[in-house]
Structures are given as C-alpha cells and as structure tokens.
Amino acid sequence: MKHSTSDGTVYQRNGFGPTVVLIHGLGMNRAMWQWQLPSLTKDFDVLTYDLWGHGESSNPPSRPSLRLFSDQLIGLLNEANVTTTGVVGFSIGGMIARRFAYDHPSRLSALAI
C-alpha cells in the first residue's frame, strides 16, 4: 500500500517481521525493488521509498546531500513508527545508508550495501 509523509516522501510498506528499508539508486525509484519484494515480505516488514526528486516523492527542500537524504530517511522512520531497521542501499542508496548509519547508529539493526 502506498503512503506519503508530511515532507512529501512517497513509500510503500509490505510484509511482517523485522523492518528493512530498501534505498534505490540515482535516477531510479522504489519500483526497482519489485522483484525482491515477494521473497523479502515473507519474513520482513519492508519499506521502499522514493528519494526526494525521484519517482513520486516531492523535490528536495534544499540542495541534495547525503545528510539531507539521511534526514529524509529518519523522518520516514519516525512517521512510520519504526524504532530500528535494517537498511539496504544500492548505488547512491548505499552512500545514503552509510550516512544514516553514521548519523543514527541507535536506529540501525543491520546494514547492507
């Protein structure tokens, strides 16, 4: 099911279990994970989202940076009531995942880049 946060981040949440967030690559959107979702949602609560300026999400509120995208992710987790999560990042998503791990280590249960 598709949702939108107060800052214009569009995301989907599917499955049950520990939460895992999937971050897409530059110029892509959350649909890139469509082939992994059937397997992952059997065991995990999976959040996929569009980075600001990608897919259905709004444009970034200021000049894009890894810090800004890390802030986008923490905002998403707060609005979705997720306390800890595993994060999987592809391409720039991996860079954002590393920045998120640096900024919010207590919110991270696992990291895959």
Task: Give, region by region, the residue ranges found by the protein language model.
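Conserved hydrolase catalytic core segment
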Residues: 83-113
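Active-site micro-motifs of SAM-dependent methyltransferase domains
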Residues: 28, 53, 94
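Structural cue for short, hydrophobic secondary-structure segments
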Residues: 22-25, 48
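Active-site loop/oxyanion-hole signature of alpha/beta-hydrolase fold enzymes
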Residues: 7, 31-38, 47-88
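Alpha/beta-hydrolase fold catalytic core
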Residues: 1-20, 41-45, 82-84, 113
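Active-site glycine-rich loops that stabilize anionic/oxyanionic intermediates
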Residues: 16-17, 25-28, 91
